[in-house]
């Protein structure tokens, strides 16, 4: 901060933007990361500190393999390799872009949520019901 120059990268998840089913702690802490990144961007961008938010759907890491979510791998979209995600982050830093999405469908889902929140919530409730009824 004293140098008034630099980049901060916050790794959240689409779970922090769209809310995921299954793991309360995961979803709420990812929401907190989104809020922190937005606040820092608003508060420090004009002071030379650039903030980016990485919100992947699925990255090929041990965490993805060890998940207990019934739909996690399916909902993760196209699983990205860590090296590809790292390249996306570097591009975003160079472009001074805030939001880093790893999958094109994520932008569509964000738009659907913001365009009609009630419809989005109803759809997510239906999905939760399907998950709850799975063996």
Regions found by a protein language model. Give the residues of each.
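Active-site loop immediately N-terminal to the catalytic Tyr-X3-Lys motif
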Residues: 20-24
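Conserved catalytic-site region of short-chain dehydrogenase/reductase
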Residues: 16-18
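Active-site helix of classical SDR
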Residues: 29
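Helix-to-beta-strand junctions that scaffold the AdoMet/dcAdoMet cofactor pocket
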Residues: 1-4, 45
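Residue(s) in the substrate-gating loop at a strand-loop-helix junction
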Residues: 13
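SDR active-site lid
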Residues: 42-105
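Catalytic tyrosine of NAD(P)H-dependent dehydrogenase/reductases that use a Tyr as the general acid/base
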Residues: 26, 34
